[in-house]
C-alpha cells in the first residue's frame, strides 16, 4: 500500500507545486511541537489525529466536522494534533491546517507522505508545527536532508518506521524523538506489541530517543501497558474519532 500511495504523491507533486504559492516571509523560530507535548500534565501524552478516512478503515467519520473534532480534542486535554492532508487515500486537505490555526491555539503535525523538499516549505507555509517523515519511503540521505531543512524552517520532525530493517537508517539521525508504527504500511496489518518489541530488541540503538507509539490502540489497558513499560507518548486517531478511547 505504501508504494501505491508514494507513486500517487509523485504523480500529484507537479500539480501541487503549480497550485500552491509558498510564503517565503515566515517566522522561522522553533515551533516547539514536542516541547508542548512533553509539558502536558496528562498521564498519557497523546497526539490526537484528525482524519476522515484511511486505507485500513475506509470512511472513519461520515459527519466530518474539522473544527468540532479539534475543539473536542482540546476540551479533552489534548495539546497536540496530527492532521491528515493526503487527498487520495485519507481524503485530507491542505486547507485543514490553516482552518484550525485561524480559530484555535494548538500545535499541529502535518500527516502526509513527504518525498520532496518542496513539501517541507509548503508545510511551514500552511502553518504546520511538525512534519512526518516515513523512513520506509525515503533514503538515508533524504531523511538527513529533510530533517536539516525542517529544522532550518523551525519545524519539528516525527520520523517514523515500522520495519526493523530501517534501524540502520534512523539510528544516528539528529532527532530526540522517533515514532514506531504498530501498523505495517505495506500490508496494513497491526500488532499492538510491535513498538515495544522493536524498542526492546534494539535498545542500544533506540535508548537515546523519546519514542512515540503509533497505531492500533483501542483500549485504555493498552496505554497502561505501554506506560508501565516506559512509553507514554502516543499518536492515536481512529479510536479517538470513534469514541473508543
Language-model features: locations:
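Conserved N-terminal beta1-alpha1 strand-loop-helix module at the mouth
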Residues: 1-108, 115-118, 140, 151, ...
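A structural alpha-helix within SAM-dependent methyltransferase catalytic domains
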Residues: 74, 98-101, 124, 147, ...
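Catalytic cores of alpha/beta
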Residues: 115-127, 162-174, 204-236
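Glycine-rich phosphate-binding active-site loops on the catalytic face of alpha/beta enzymes
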Residues: 125-142, 179-188, 217, 229-245
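C-terminal helical cap(s) of enzyme catalytic domains, especially alpha/beta-barrels
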Residues: 192-202, 224-227, 240-245
